[in-house]
UniProtKB/Swiss-Prot annotation:
Residue ranges with Low complexity bias: 114-141
The keyword Signal is annotated on this UniProt entry: yes
Disordered, as annotated region: 61-165
Gene source species: Staphylococcus aureus (strain NCTC 8325 / PS 47)
Role this protein plays: Secreted protein that plays an essential role in immune innate response inhibition by interacting with and inhibiting host TLR2. In turn, bacteria recognition by immune cells is impaired and cytokine production is inhibited. Mechanistically, by interacting with TLR2, blocks ligand binding and thus inhibits activation. Second, by interacting with an already formed TLR2-lipopeptide complex, prevents TLR heterodimerization and downstream signaling. The interaction with host TLR2 does not involve sialyl Lewis X interactions.
Domain notes: The C-terminal domain contains a V-shape binding site for sialyl Lewis X.
UniProt keyword annotation of tRNA-binding present: no
Protein name: Staphylococcal superantigen-like 3
Subcellular location: Secreted
């Protein structure tokens, strides 16, 4: 019995010792775990502080890089971009610096340094504009000098223009108008609604009205009239008609006519120099109106002999074989009543022109 009790007590003591050992080991383990947890906390805090310091250093490095970039960038950049970069840099610096230093940096960024850059950019931007505008200013006087040098070279042209403008401008304008010739036409009259009667001709489906003045007023009655030729020069709007002519009505040829006459032109200029020209003038009509002769001769004189340039007076004399003559005065337009006069074209002997 004693042995059993001794054995039981020894077993109980062994169990107690093992439990104590396990308790101690568990407590030791718990202390180790707590110590590791405690150790880990400061290490995490240290790592976070290191990261914050790294970010602060990186931010300061970026601000320094931004400042160096701003100093290296050309002065032609706009001031608002620099302000934006500085404000962004100041925002980054807020993480690492205290509030007082942030206010200092903001005040520094608000200082008139960008204004100096703006003034420099404006001065530099205006300088190339002045360089661009200077070449036209240097070139502008050159054409003025050329015009001054050109004007004394043409006094005769100016004299001709001043002479032509008051005296011969209207005559030159009239005798350079286009003329129209129509053969074998049919003429008819309408009821007169003006003081002058008109013969109507329709060549090429267009109506031309011809005023019957002078001898034509009695020669042509109610009509109609067939086989007539007309020489048309459109006149000004005298009778409230857009397109009309005066005179120039003749009979159509009964045979072909090629009658050459001598045309002699004598011209005396303002300096007293006299020039003479002799040529042939072709007559192709049995009956020809004074309107057609006068207009065609003056137009030829304008084109070949500068009539109504600086000279515009003189006469054109149509001499007939029977001793008669018809005179056109160059300083005035042929009268309307004479535009209706008709002569025998084959009876013309010669034509004399005197221009002065």
């Amino acid at each position: 019995m004693k042995m059993r009790t001794i054995a039981k007590t020894s077993l109980a003591l062994g169990l107690l010792t093992t439990g104590a050992i396990t308790v101690t080991t568990q407590s030791v383990k718990a202390e180790k775990i707590q110590s590791t947890k405690v150790d880990k906390v400061p290490t995490l805090k240290a790592e976070r502080l290191a990261m914050i310091n790294i970010t602060a250093g990186a931010n300061s490095a970026t601000t320094q890089a931004a400042n160096t970039r701003q100093e290296r960038t050309p002065k032609l950049e706009k001031a608002p971009n620099t302000n934006e970069e500085k404000t962004s840099a100041s925002k980054i610096e807020k993480i690492s610096q205290p509030k007082q230093e942030e206010q200092k940096t903001l005040n520094i960024s608000a200082t008139p340094a960008p204004k100096q850059e703006q003034s420099q950019t404006t001065t530099e931007s205006t300088t190339p504009k002045t360089k661009v505008t200077t070449p036209p200013s240097t070139n502008t006087p050159q054409p003025m000098q050329s015009t001054k040098s050109d004007t004394p070279q043409s006094p005769t042209i100016k004299q001709a223009q001043t002479d032509m403008t008051p005296k011969y401008e209207d005559l030159r304008a009239y005798y350079t108008k286009p003329s129209f010739e129509f053969e074998k036409q049919f003429g008819f009259m309408l009821k007169p609604w003006t003081t002058v009667r008109f013969m109507n001709v329709i060549p090429n489906r267009f109506i031309y009205k011809i005023a019957l003045v002078g001898k034509d007023e009695k020669k042509y009655k109610d009509g109609p009239y067939d086989n007539i030729d007309v020489f048309i020069v459109l006149e000004d709007n005298k009778y409230q008609l857009k397109k009309y002519s005066v005179g120039g009505i003749t009979k159509t040829n009964s045979k072909k006519v090629n009658h050459k006459v001598e045309l002699s032109i004598t011209k005396k200029d303002n300096q007293g120099m006299i020039s003479r020209d002799v040529s042939e003038y072709m007559i192709t009509k049995e009956e020809i109106s004074l309107k057609e002769l006068d207009f065609k001769l003056r137009k030829q004189l304008i084109e070949k002999h500068n009539l109504y340039g600086n000279m515009g007076s003189g006469t054109i004399v149509i001499k007939m074989k029977n001793g008669g003559k018809y005179t056109f005065e160059l300083h005035k337009k042929l009268q309307e009543h004479r535009m209706a006069d008709v002569i025998d074209g084959t009876n013309i002997d010669n034509i004399e022109v005197n221009i002065k």
